[in-house]
């Protein structure tokens, strides 16, 4: 059975290492018969969450703000798997990904108990060095508290310049992880 997969790509580099990893993942997932939609968050107009608590009143437009999140919300609702992809910035995910993820709270506001939709997820990250521990802690904590199930993590270190991920085993790991989803 085909799965709906969305990739929230928080990298500002169109041809960077995070994008190389997500491309490998998407190729594997599509070869396994899944539908993949990728959002390049840095190229979208996404306002930050303002904590207004006015989300969830209209399930079709869950956030009070109107911007490019309107493209992400329906895909997120339909997704079986959410891929969180980001370069490692100051031992965390990029602001682009954090901003978009914060805005997904509007979907939880549609539920009277603020429950998030149950999803499976993947974490994909690239970094100049290593030091993924803080991001992994955030991701594991997120999984636990919103009730998602992790399908895996691809953490590719020591990739500074675009193209550095080529030939690294993490590229095949991303492909194989995508291919394993069905």
Mark where each language-model region is:
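N-terminal beta1-alpha1-beta2 submodule of the flavodoxin-like/Rossmannoid cofactor-binding fold
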Residues: 1-85, 91-106, 168-182
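Cofactor-binding loop segments of dinucleotide-utilizing enzymes, especially the Rossmann-like FAD-
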Residues: 10, 41, 125-128, 156
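A generic structural signal for short coil/turn motifs at secondary-structure boundaries
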Residues: 13-16, 130, 161-165
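Glycine-rich phosphate/pyrophosphate-binding loop and the adjoining helix
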Residues: 31-32, 140-182
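Structural signal for conserved beta-strand scaffold positions within catalytic alpha/beta enzyme cores
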Residues: 38-40, 65, 123, 152-155
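Catalytic nucleophile loop
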Residues: 83-86, 120-122
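Short glycine-rich anion-binding loops that position phosphate/pyrophosphate groups of nucleotides
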Residues: 88-90, 128-129
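Short, glycine-/small-residue-rich phosphate/pyrophosphate-handling segment
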Residues: 95-96, 110-153
């Amino acid at each position: 059975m085909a799965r709906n997969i969305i990739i929230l790509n928080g990298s500002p580099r169109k041809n960077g290492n995070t994008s190389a990893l997500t491309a490998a993942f998407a190729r594997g997932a599509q070869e396994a018969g899944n539908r993949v939609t990728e959002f390049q968050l840095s190229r979208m107009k996404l306002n930050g969450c303002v904590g207004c608590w006015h989300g969830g009143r209209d399930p079709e437009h869950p956030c009070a703000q109107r911007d490019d999140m309107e493209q992400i919300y329906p895909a997120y609702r339909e997704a079986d798997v959410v891929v969180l992809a980001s370069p490692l910035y100051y031992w965390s995910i990029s602001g682009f990904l954090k901003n978009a993820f914060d805005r997904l709270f509007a979907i939880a506001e549609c539920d009277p108990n603020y429950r998030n939709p149950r999803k499976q997820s993947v974490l994909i990250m690239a970094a100049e060095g290593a030091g993924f521990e803080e991001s992994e802690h955030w991701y594991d904590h997120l999984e636990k508290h919103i009730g998602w199930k992790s399908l895996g993590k691809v953490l590719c270190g020591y990739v500074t310049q675009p193209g550095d991920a080529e030939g690294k085993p993490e590229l095949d790991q991303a492909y194989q992880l995508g291919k394993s989803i069905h």
